[in-house]
From Swiss-Prot:
Acute phase protein with antibacterial activity against the Gram-negative bacteria E.coli (MIC=6.25 ug/ml) and S.sonnei (MIC=12.5 ug/ml). Lacks antibacterial activity against the Gram-negative bacteria P.vulgaris, P.rettgeri and P.aeruginosa, and against the Gram-positive bacteria B.subtilis, S.aureus, M.luteus, B.megaterium, C.bovis and E.cloacae. The keyword Ribosomal protein does not apply. One of its GO terms (biological process) is defense response to Gram-negative bacterium. It comes from Sarcophaga peregrina. On the 2D-gel the determined MW is: 8 kDa. Residues 1-37 are annotated as: Disordered. This is Diptericin. Belongs to the attacin/sarcotoxin-2 family. Induction: By injury to the body wall of the larva. Expression peaks at 10 hours post-injury and is maintained at this level for at least 3 days. Synthesized by the fat body and secreted into the hemolymph. It is found in: Secreted. The keyword Secreted applies. Keywords: Antibiotic, Antimicrobial, Immunity, Innate immunity, Secreted. Transmembrane segments: none annotated.
Length: 37
């Protein structure tokens, strides 16, 4: 929770990560990669 961006992004992360693993950033990165492919 220490590398969380501004509150606005923090609200969207859980939805983008779909519960991703470990940290919101990890789930967010994985989701972005999936969308690009």
């Amino acid at each position: 929770d220490l590398h969380i961006p501004p509150p606005d992004n923090k609200i969207n992360w859980p939805q983008l990560s779909g519960g991703g693993g470990g940290s919101p950033k990890t789930g967010y990165d994985i989701n972005i990669n999936a969308q690009q492919k």
